[in-house]
Swiss-Prot record:
Glycosylation (residues): 93, 99-100, 104, 177, 195, 249, 275, 353
Species whose genome carries this gene: Hylobates lar
Sites of S-palmitoyl cysteine lipidation: 404, 406
Main location, first listed in the record: membrane
Gene: MUC1
Name of the protein in its database record: Mucin-1
Biased composition (Polar residues): 38-48, 90-102, 109-122, 191-213, 233-252
Amino acid sequence: MTPGTQSLFFLLLLLTVLTVVTGSGHASSTPGGEKETSATQRSSMPSSTEKKVVSMTSSVLSSHSPGSGSSTTQGQDVSLAPATEPASGSAATWGQDVTSVPVTRPAPGSTTSPAQDVTSAPDTRPALGSTAPPVHGVTSAPDTRPTLGSTAPPVHGVTSAPDTRPTLGSTAPPVHNVTSASGSASGSASTLVHNGTSARATTTPASKSTPFSIPSHHSDTPTTLTSHSTKTDASSTHHSTVSPLTSSNHSTSPQLSIGVSFFFLSFHISNLQFNSSLEDPSTNYYQELQRDISELILQIYKQGDFLGVSNIKFRPGSVVVQSTLAFREGTTNVHDVEAQFNQHKTEAASRYNLTISDVSVSDVPFPFSAQSGAGVPGWGIALLVLVCVLVALAIVYLIALAVCQCRRKNYGQLDIFPARDAYHPMSEYPTYHTHGRYVPPSSTNRSPYEKVSEGNGGSSLSYTNPAVAATSANL
């Protein structure tokens, strides 16, 4: 066989193998019954010459079955678009902007949730025997698989994007407003569509990752655009726990401090008589009259500086109405409030059938008078005063007792009858004899003058009264 014939057969064999490998859709079945289909889009361009294949294009389909212990959920509602094939013998040119999308499978021990309502892009492939020019710069997507033990949330409503093919070398704007995994997915990536790239959402969360919300107005999908091939990295793995992203309005409205002036309004209703119903706020008559007075005051003071009326009360004297009016501080005074009320008294007479007189307005510091509580009863106050008086008297008595005790220690003793016996006749005492003695403090010795001689004058120290002696002799 000549070299020319060998090269022709080699070219036909190579073309057949290349068409079978890249043109047919491969589907792999897992033990759980999961089926995943990758769709590769190709464009047909007219060509009349046969070119030598410079580089081989391989669509890497990463199809790995999960190991033992893995739980794979069967896909639901997966629909494939019809495949359109050109006629046999037509010259099909493979586009230079071909992107292969990886098929991601969970690692052993991972749990994959079902993908619902997934629509794949239409498959357009040439027939066998067609002549294809060489394809340059074809990039195969890497194999992305989730981490061991990770759990992927279900993907709902993922629809492939249409085939938009800009001119070679042009820059396609990114596609925004992409929402993946029903608005919240962990590490989800949305594939941007450029130069005939089929969009496929792949969710590859890391182990024990926390899902966070992805706003619809932001997309973080990296996109690489080249003149020969387009590679879309449609998977991202988060290896850290991400806290939930929350959007809150931190704007705070400034708080306005408003000064308030209070006025005490009192007037008489002469055409009404006070009765017991006006003493009970639960009666209908009390409530109706209070409502009429409130409406009247609100109609009289319509300006924006008027804040309200409160504490409406009734007391005898025909009917005396007492209320408290609140205004913004510095906007009005007592005279203006009284004058404005007097101007609209006729409205009360015509509309509410009330004859108002003796209007008086006074300035008060607070809208409500401080109501004293139960307080201390009268007998309690009297008892408290009595206890205080008794305590004061006891203190005075103790002070006087202490003073007397101290003074007694500094005084001597006056002995009226210094003799040891209990009775002494008067004859034993001299005329000018003092009937006592003074004992100084802390002295125990008896005075020598208090000694009385025995035998009434038998001693040399005795004294005899001659007058008394003569009288006794005469008797």
